[in-house]
C-alpha cells in the first residue's frame, strides 16, 4: 500500500471511528466459523466501498483476524487481501471502473495450481448500515442498494450505530481448485456464486418489503375465502354486505401488525441500554443454524417456550443482533392495551384471541392473514404452549396456530417452511411471584398500563439470560416422511382439514416440545435451587452445596442430556458466588463456615427455576432414588424400574429418548455415578457408597415429588379399579394437596391440574386403564408397590390412609 493510500485511509477512518459502532456476526468469527489464522485468509465484499472496508478492518483487528489492508505475499507475489465483487455505482454514472474481482479470483486460483500446499481461506463478508426493507410503494430502491459516495456518507452518518459486519463460513480455494479447476471460467462462476450469496444474505438480514397496510387489507378482502366468510356473516347475522365487510376490516385492524423499522431501531437502542443494566449477559447458542436457514430461503417459524412477557422483546432483540429480521409475533390479545399494544404492533406483533370458537369470520381473517405473512416471506413467531408457564415446566402444546401453519403449506406455497424450537431461560423471571399466587388460586390480573409500570419498577439484577436455538424441523421433509400423500390435499382457496391433519399436528407439537427441552440451559440459579430444594431443611453448608453442584455439573457435562443442551463452563464455586449476587438466598456465618439457606417464603418461587431443568436431571435422580431406597439392586432391576416409569416421565417432561434407547442411557449414567463414587458396582449389582450418601440422597430428591405424585394416582387406581378418569384426576389432586400440607411440599406443580391430566392420559395410552375407566388391578398394584418402595414410609402411610378414611 502506497504512502498516499495510507494517508487517505487514516483520514477516512477519523470520522468512521466517531460515527460507526458496528457489531460482528458471529460474535467470535474465528472460533465459531473455524477460521485457521495460521493459513492465508482473504475477504470478499459485495461491492466497492472504502467505508465498508475500514469497518471490516476494525472488526478484524478487534477479533485477531488478519488485517484486510495488509496484502498477501505468496511466492513473491503481492495480492490484495480483499476482493470487491462489484465496482459499485458512482456519483457520475458514466464513470465505472473496470471490475477486477474475476481477475483477482483467477490470480488466486492460478497460485493454487502452481503451489499444491497452498490453501487460501476465502471469507465472504457483508457490511450493512441500516436494515430498513422499505415499503412496497413509495421508494424506488430499497435502502440496502449499492450506494455511491454521497449516499454512503449520509447512510453512515445516520445509520453508523446500526451496522454490523457479517462473516460467512470460509470457502477453501484449494478445494475449489482441486474439484473445479483454475481457469477463468471458474473465476467467473466464483464471482457469480458470491453475488447470489450476498443477495440472499441481504434478504435474510432485511426481509421482504413491507406492504402498505391498506393495500394488505384490500388484498385480504379480495381473497375468495374472506369474501365467502363475509357473505356468510351477512347472511347469518342478517346485516348488509357492507356492514359485514366493515366487520372484516375491523378484525384486520385488530389482528394485523404495523411493522416499523424506525421503531425497531429505537427499541433496539432502549433495550441495549436496558439489557446492559438489568442482565449480566445474554447467552445465545446455535444461532448459526438459523442464519443458514434464512440464507437458504426457508420460511422460518420460531417456536419458543414461554416463560415471561420479556420473551417477546428478548427474542426479537437477539435475532436482530444475529443479523436476522425480527419476526412477526403472535401475541395474546390481552397485550393489546395502550401504550404497549401500539408499540408491540410496530415491533411486529399481530394479536390473537384466546379462542376462535363461534366466530367463523375471525378465524378466516386470521388464517388468511397468517397465510399472507408466509406467502410474502416474513418470518413468524408464536408460542406453541399458548401462554406463559406458571410452574417453570413446559405446558402441553396448543395446536391451533401450528395447524394453520400446515394449512398455509396446503395452499401450495413454494418456499419451505421450517419450525425452529427455542429454549428461553432466565435466572430471574419478573412475574414469578404472580405465578405462585395464581397457582394458589388467585385470579389472574388483567394486563394494563399500571400493572406494566409496577412490573418495570421492580426490575433489578436479572442475572443471565439464555436463548438456545434447537434442532429445526422442516415441515416439508416431515410431511414427506410421515404423510407421503399430503400434496393431494393442496387447495389454493379452501382451508383444508384432511383426516391426517389433527394427528400429524399433535405429533409435530409433541416433537417441538421435546426439541425445546433438548436445548435446555443449566445455569447458576436453577442448579443452586435444585440442590437447596433437595435438602429437607432447604439449607446446605457451602461445602455441601459446592459438592452437589459438582455432581450435577459432572453428570450434565459427561453424560449430556442432548447435543443442544448447554451447561455452564464456570466452576461450582463460581456459580455459587454468582447465584448469591441474585439476593435469593441467605447466608449464615459461624465459626465453621457459611450456611446457605433458601428462605421459606422464597422456596415456592424457586421451584420455578428448578423445574426449568427438571427434565435434564430426572433420570439420574430416578437412578439415585432406586439405589438410595433399595441400597442394593441389579442393573436388570434398575432398567425394569426405569422402563416401567419412563412413559409417565416422558409425557410429563417431554423427554427425548425412545424406550429402546433407555438401556444405553442408564449404562452411561451408571458409569458416571461410579466414576463420581456415588455408587459401588460389583458385577451386575449396584449398591450405595456410604461415604457419598449425602450427594446421592440430594440427587435422588430431584425425583421425590414426582414419584409421590405417581404413587397417589396408582394407589387410588388400585384401590378403586372402576374409577372414571375425571374422578381419578380430581381425587389425585385432592390427595396431593393434603400431602403437600402434611409433609411441607412447597412445589405448586405438585397438585397442578395439568400434571394429573397428563398422567391419567398416559395411564390410558399405556393400557393401565381403558377408555371406559376400568383398570387392570394387578398391574396397577404392581406399579404402586414399586413406587411405594421409593417413597418414605410416612408419605406412604398418608397416601394409603386416604381410602381407609373414606371407608
From Swiss-Prot:
Localization per record: Cell inner membrane
Pathway(s) annotated for this protein in UniProt: Phospholipid metabolism; CDP-diacylglycerol biosynthesis; CDP-diacylglycerol from sn-glycerol 3-phosphate: step 1/3
InterPro entries attached to this UniProt entry: GPAT/DHAPAT, GPAT/DHAPAT_C, GPAT/DHAPAT_LPLAT, GPAT_PlsB, Plipid/glycerol_acylTrfase
Domain of life per record: Bacteria
Catalyses which reaction(s): sn-glycerol 3-phosphate + an acyl-CoA = a 1-acyl-sn-glycero-3-phosphate + CoA
Entry annotated with the keyword Transcription: no
One GO molecular-function entry: glycerol-3-phosphate O-acyltransferase activity
Protein EC: 2.3.1.15
Keywords assigned by UniProt, alphabetized: Acyltransferase, Cell inner membrane, Cell membrane, Lipid biosynthesis, Lipid metabolism, Membrane, Phospholipid biosynthesis, Phospholipid metabolism, Transferase
GO biological process: CDP-diacylglycerol biosynthetic process; fatty acid metabolic process
Family from the record: Belongs to the GPAT/DAPAT family.
Protein name: Glycerol-3-phosphate acyltransferase
Source organism of the structure: Klebsiella pneumoniae (strain 342)
The encoding gene: plsB
Amino acid at each position: 500500500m502506497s504512502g498516499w493510500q495510507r494517508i487517505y485511509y487514516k483520514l477516512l477512518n477519523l470520522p468512521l471511528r466517531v460515527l460507526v459502532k458496528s457489531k460482528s456476526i458471529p460474535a467470535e468469527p474465528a472460533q465459531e466459523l473455524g477460521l485457521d489464522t495460521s493459513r492465508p485468509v482473504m475477504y470478499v465484499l459485495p461491492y466497492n466501498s472504502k467505508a465498508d472496508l475500514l469497518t471490516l478492518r476494525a472488526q478484524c483487528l478487534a477479533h485477531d483476524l488478519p488485517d484486510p489492508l495488509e496484502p498477501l505475499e505468496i511466492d513473491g507475489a503481492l495480492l490484495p487481501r480483499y476482493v470487491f465483487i462489484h465496482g459499485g455505482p458512482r456519483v457520475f454514472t458514466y464513470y465505472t471502473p473496470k471490475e477486477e474481482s474475476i481477475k483477482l479470483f483467477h490470480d488466486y486460483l492460478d497460485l493454487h495450481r502452481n503451489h499444491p500446499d497452498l490453501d487460501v481461506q476465502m471469507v465472504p463478508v457483508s457490511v450493512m448500515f441500516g436494515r430498513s426493507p422499505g415499503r412496497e410503494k413509495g421508494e424506488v430502491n430499497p435502502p440496502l442498494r449499492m450506494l455511491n459516495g454521497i449516499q454512503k456518507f449520509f447512510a453512515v452518518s445516520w445509520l453508523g450505530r446500526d451496522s454490523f459486519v457479517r462473516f460467512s463460513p470460509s470457502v477453501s480455494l484449494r478445494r475449489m481448485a482441486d474439484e473445479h479447476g483454475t481457469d477463468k471460467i471458474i473465476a467467473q462462476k466464483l464471482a457469480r456464486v458470491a453475488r447470489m450469496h450476498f443477495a440472499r444474505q441481504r434478504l435474510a438480514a432485511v426481509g421482504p418489503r413491507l406492504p402498505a397496510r391498506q393495500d394488505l387489507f384490500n388484498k385480504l378482502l379480495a381473497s375468495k375465502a374472506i369474501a365467502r366468510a363475509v357473505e356468510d356473516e351477512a347472511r347469518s347475522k342478517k346485516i348488509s354486505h357492507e356492514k359485514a365487510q366493515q366487520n372484516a376490516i375491523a378484525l384486520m385492524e385488530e389482528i394485523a401488525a404495523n411493522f416499523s423499522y424506525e421503531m425497531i431501531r429505537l427499541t433496539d437502542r432502549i433495550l441495549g441500554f436496558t439489557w446492559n443494566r438489568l442482565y449480566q449477559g445474554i447467552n445465545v447458542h446455535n444461532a448459526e443454524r438459523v442464519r443458514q436457514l434464512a440464507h437458504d430461503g426457508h420460511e422460518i417459524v420460531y417456536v419458543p417456550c414461554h416463560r415471561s412477557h420479556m420473551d417477546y422483546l428478548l427474542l426479537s432483540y437477539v435475532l436482530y443482533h444475529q443479523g436476522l429480521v425480527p419476526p412477526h409475533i403472535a401475541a395474546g390479545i390481552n397485550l393489546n392495551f395502550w401504550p404497549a399494544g401500539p408499540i408491540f404492533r410496530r415491533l411486529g406483533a399481530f394479536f390473537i384471541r384466546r379462542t376462535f370458537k363461534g366466530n367463523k369470520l375471525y378465524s378466516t381473517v386470521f388464517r388468511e392473514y397468517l397465510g399472507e405473512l408466509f406467502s410474502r416471506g416474513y418470518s413468524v413467531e408464536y408460542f406453541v404452549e399458548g401462554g406463559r408457564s406458571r410452574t417453570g415446566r413446559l405446558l402441553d402444546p396448543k395446536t391451533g396456530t401450528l395447524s394453520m401453519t400446515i394449512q398455509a403449506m396446503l395452499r401450495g406455497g413454494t418456499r419451505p417452511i421450517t419450525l425452529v424450537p427455542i429454549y428461553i431461560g432466565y435466572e430471574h423471571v419478573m412475574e414469578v411471584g404472580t405465578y405462585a399466587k395464581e397457582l394458589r388460586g388467585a385470579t389472574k390480573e388483567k394486563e394494563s398500563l399500571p400493572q406494566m409500570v409496577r412490573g418495570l419498577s421492580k426490575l433489578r439484577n436479572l442475572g443471565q439470560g439464555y436463548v438456545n436455538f434447537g434442532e429445526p424441523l422442516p415441515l416439508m421433509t416431515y410431511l414427506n416422511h410421515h404423510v407421503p400423500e399430503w400434496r393431494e390435499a393442496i387447495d389454493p382457496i379452501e382451508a383444508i382439514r384432511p383426516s391426517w391433519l389433527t394427528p400429524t399436528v399433535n405429533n409435530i407439537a409433541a416433537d417441538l416440545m421435546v426439541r425445546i427441552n433438548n436445548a435446555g440451559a443449566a445455569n447458576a440459579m436453577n442448579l443452586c435451587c435444585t440442590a437447596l430444594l433437595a435438602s429437607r431443611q432447604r439449607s446446605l453448608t457451602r461445602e455441601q452445596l459446592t459438592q452437589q453442584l459438582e455432581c450435577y455439573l459432572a453428570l450434565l457435562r459427561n453424560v449430556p442430556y442432548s447435543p443442544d443442551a448447554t451447561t455452564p463452563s464456570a466452576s461450582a464455586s463460581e456459580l455459587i458466588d454468582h447465584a448469591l449476587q441474585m439476593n435469593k438466598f441467605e447466608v449464615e456465618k459461624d465459626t465453621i463456615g457459611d450456611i446457605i439457606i433458601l428462605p421459606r417464603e422464597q422456596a415456592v418461587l424457586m421451584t420455578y427455576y428448578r423445574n426449568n431443568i427438571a427434565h435434564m436431571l430426572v433420570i439420574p435422580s430416578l437412578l439415585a432414588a432406586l439405589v438410595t431406597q433399595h441400597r442394593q439392586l441389579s442393573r436388570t432391576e434398575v432398567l425394569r424400574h426405569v422402563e416401567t416409569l419412563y412413559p409417565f416421565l416422558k409425557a410429563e417432561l417431554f423427554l427425548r429418548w425412545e424406550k429402546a434407547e433407555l438401556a444405553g442411557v442408564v449404562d452411561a449414567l451408571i458409569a458416571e455415578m461410579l466414576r463420581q463414587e456415588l455408587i459401588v458396582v460389583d458385577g451386575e449389582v449396584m449398591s450405595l457408597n456410604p461415604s457419598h450418601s449425602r450427594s446421592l440422597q440430594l440427587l435422588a430428591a430431584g425425583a421425590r415429588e414426582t414419584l409421590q405424585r405417581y404413587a397417589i394416582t396408582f394407589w387410588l387406581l388400585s384401590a378403586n379399579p372402576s374409577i372414571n378418569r375425571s374422578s381419578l384426576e380430581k381425587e389425585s389432586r385432592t390427595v396431593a394437596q393434603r400431602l403437600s400440607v402434611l409433609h411441607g411440599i412447597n412445589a405448586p406443580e405438585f397438585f397442578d391440574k395439568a400434571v394429573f391430566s397428563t398422567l391419567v392420559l398416559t395411564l390410558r395410552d399405556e393400557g393401565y386403564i381403558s377408555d371406559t375407566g376400568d383398570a387392570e388391578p394387578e398391574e396397577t398394584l404392581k406399579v404402586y408397590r414399586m413406587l411405594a418402595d421409593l417413597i418414605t414410609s410416612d408419605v406412604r402411610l398418608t397416601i394409603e390412609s386416604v381410602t381407609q378414611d373414606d371407608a
